[in-house]
A protein has these predicted regions:
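A beta-strand edge to alpha-helix "cap/lid" segment located at domain peripheries
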Residues: 4-7, 21-147
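Bacterial N-terminal signal peptides
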Residues: 7-16
């Protein structure tokens, strides 16, 4: 009887576990797509010095480190966009990866076309708050020789 109960339990539980993993994977890929889309919009808005996206996307407690190692708050970042010191013109992102950890996302890749640097490796951290992704931290490192 015990054996029958164990086999029955496993027969019922295994498909449920597999379904749960598939649903979680779908949720992660949807979140990855959301972050990729936000990052595309982010680059476009910075290229045109449009601060609307930064005001909406950056968390109020945002802290970033730019390619020169300076720490920047949300307001300092927005001021830099307006002044044209953070970003100027068209940029291209490559080797992009997004990893989802529940309500946190980590985005990495390269961006070319950043003012004062040929190529920058970046990492950005997002947290989902009130059903909306917010960038809470970022860091850019200049890659010598554009490699």
């Amino acid at each position: 009887m015990k054996r029958f109960l164990v086999v029955t339990f496993l027969a019922v539980a295994m498909p449920l576990l597999a379904f749960g993993q598939a649903a979680n994977k779908k949720s992660s890929s949807k979140a990855e797509e959301e972050i990729m889309k936000l990052e595309d919009q982010w680059v476009q808005s910075r290229a045109t010095k449009d601060t609307t996206m930064a005001k909406d996307l950056l968390s109020d407690d945002y802290l970033g480190a730019n390619v020169t190692g300076q720490a920047q708050t949300k307001q300092q970042y927005i001021d830099g966009i307006t002044a044209g010191t953070i970003f100027a013109g068209k940029a291209e992102m490559t080797d992009r990866k997004v990893r989802i950890y529940g309500d946190t996302a980590v985005s990495t890749g390269f961006v070319t076309g950043v003012a004062g640097a040929d190529k920058v490796r970046y990492i950005r951290v997002y947290v989902k708050r009130n059903n909306k992704w917010r960038q809470v931290a970022s860091q850019g490192t200049r890659v010598e020789g554009g490699q």
